[in-house]
């Protein structure tokens, strides 16, 4: 929703909103934290890897896919990852990898795309809030 009042840059903003996004923020969950023989808890920004190609996916503007944040979610009992994916691979259920301290090939963590775009893993229908 864009406010009705005119503001500097409104025309450009409205034009940008009409464009099809080339990358989409997705919510993913890590499938395994023990890929190197010991449990690690990744944090920060890491490259996202397509397991089919072994490469970092790149969107139509040349931007590489990466995680924007990740943390353990006690309510879900899962490790949740946020990251931008090109729209071509932003598919719910898609398997991907993140590279985290990949020493000797022991730092590729499997993850699954859970939500493409807006959404919530915890209480997606806001039922708990309204109870």
What are these language model-derived features?
Residues 1-131:
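Conserved, structured C-terminal
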């Amino acid at each position: 929703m864009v406010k009705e009042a005119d503001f500097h840059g409104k025309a450009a903003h409205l034009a940008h909103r009409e464009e099809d996004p080339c990358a989409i923020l997705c919510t993913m969950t890590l499938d395994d934290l023990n890929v190197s023989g010991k449990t690690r808890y990744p944090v920060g920004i890491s490259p996202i890897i397509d397991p089919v190609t072994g490469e970092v996916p790149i969107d139509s503007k040349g931007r590489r896919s990466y995680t924007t944040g990740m943390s353990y979610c006690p309510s879900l009992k899962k490790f949740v990852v946020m990251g931008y994916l090109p729209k071509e691979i932003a598919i719910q259920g898609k398997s991907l990898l993140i590279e985290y301290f990949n020493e000797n090939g022991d730092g590729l963590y499997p993850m699954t795309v859970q939500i493409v775009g807006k959404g919530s893993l915890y209480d997606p229908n806001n039922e708990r809030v309204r109870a």
